[in-house]
From Swiss-Prot:
Gene3D superfamilies: DNA helicase RuvA subunit, C-terminal domain (1.10.8.10), Vaccinia Virus protein VP39 (3.40.50.150). The keyword Transferase applies. Belongs to the protein N5-glutamine methyltransferase family. PrmB subfamily. InterPro entries: DNA_methylase_N6_adenine_CS, HemK-like, Ribosome_uL3_MTase, SAM-dependent_MTases_sf, Small_mtfrase_dom. This is Ribosomal protein uL3 glutamine methyltransferase. It comes from Xylella fastidiosa (strain 9a5c). One of its GO terms (cellular component) is cytosol. It is an enzyme of class 2 (transferase). It catalyses: L-glutaminyl-[ribosomal protein uL3] + S-adenosyl-L-methionine = N(5)-methyl-L-glutaminyl-[ribosomal protein uL3] + S-adenosyl-L-homocysteine + H(+). GO terms for biological process: methylation. Methylates large ribosomal subunit protein uL3 on a specific glutamine residue.
Length: 312
């Protein structure tokens, strides 16, 4: 369904609020899929309007009645049309995304920044860190670098590594490191832990690929713009997660902690490893497939974890 600006739209849409309402209506009517930074049509329309008009994200409500020039309407409606007809995620249309209160560059080199781990970062990882003295932290499967850079931003005394197998993702992460002056973040190319020999951490955080093959094949069109490498994770979504569980103890201090997102693969992980004491994080909006687990717990159950990982 096209939403190109018609003469009627040019005549009847006058203000910022008019355009936001129009965009939200078109997005809802088109049955778009949300979840790439924003979870509803109104927020997506708002971000596209503000981006097209070069306005700040915290624009006061008084500006909502500001009238637009004809050329400004054209810019806004062109973005609306791409969102509807091409199903391009908003973050890829605007070129940026918010994560943990920070604005990151976003493009198809890496997944759009989104993870409930942002809430943990802004809460200082409490109560999970429980007073641990973190000096070195790792963001494994860093993608755009959003988790690593946010950890470094809110914990300037930490030394943070961001590791990823994708050179494309690391190039984007480097741009975000420069953009956000993340001087305490180092980016490393690594296939899981292979490029991190000799490095040890008090905290490892990971948002790895965890979407099953069947789910990946059935994802809405919006997800097709993202690199499949960051999504697909085998028949049950745990191919990479099990390797992380197996190898993390070699890179954690004895009292170290692993925090990992597995999304809807949570139930399968618990079914495979019922003996492991995973602490599932409760977020403000409920439980969302993120666990914390102690290094000693992974060591105690290394054999069954390693056996499962070897099957992948």
């Amino acid at each position: 369904m096209a939403v190109a600006m018609t003469p009627a739209a040019a005549d009847e849409l006058h203000t910022i609020v008019d355009l936001i309402r129009y965009g939200a209506s078109r997005f809802s009517e088109a049955g778009l899929t949300f979840g790439h930074s924003y979870d509803n049509a109104l927020d997506e329309a708002t971000q596209l309007v503000l981006h097209a008009l070069h306005l700040p994200p915290d624009l006061g409500p008084a500006y909502g009645q500001a009238r637009l020039l004809h050329t400004e309407k054209e810019c806004v409606l062109a973005l609306f049309e791409r969102r509807v007809t091409e199903r391009v995620p908003v973050a890829y249309l605007t070129g940026d995304a918010w994560f943990a209160g920070l604005n990151f560059k976003s493009d198809a080199r890496a997944l759009v920044p989104r993870s409930p781990i942002a809430e943990l970062i802004q809460a200082g990882f409490e109560p999970w860190l429980a007073g641990r003295d973190v000096r070195h932290a790792l963001d494994l499967c860093t993608g755009s670098g959003c988790i690593a850079i946010a950890m470094g931003h809110y914990n300037p005394h930490w030394s943070v590594d961001g590791a990823d197998i994708s050179e494309d993702a690391l190039s984007l992460a480097l741009e975000n490191k420069v953009r956000l002056l993340a001087h305490n973040v180092e980016l490393i190319k690594s296939d899981v832990f292979a490029g991190l020999v000799g490095r040890r951490y008090q905290l490892i955080v990971s948002n790895p690929p965890y979407v099953t093959d069947a789910e990946t094949d059935a994802l809405p069109q919006e997800y097709g713009y993202e690199p499949e490498l960051g999504l697909r994770a085998g028949p049950d979504g745990l191919n990479l997660v099990l390797k992380i569980l197996r190898d993390a103890p070699a890179h954690l201090d004895e009292e170290g902690l692993l925090i990992c997102e597995v999304g809807e693969s949570e139930q399968q992980l618990v079914r495979l490893l019922p003996q492991v004491d995973f602490a599932w994080v409760e977020f403000k909006v409920g439980q969302m497939g993120v666990f914390a687990v102690e290094c000693r717990e992974l060591i105690a159950h290394h054999d069954p974890i390693a056996a499962l990982a070897a099957e992948r």
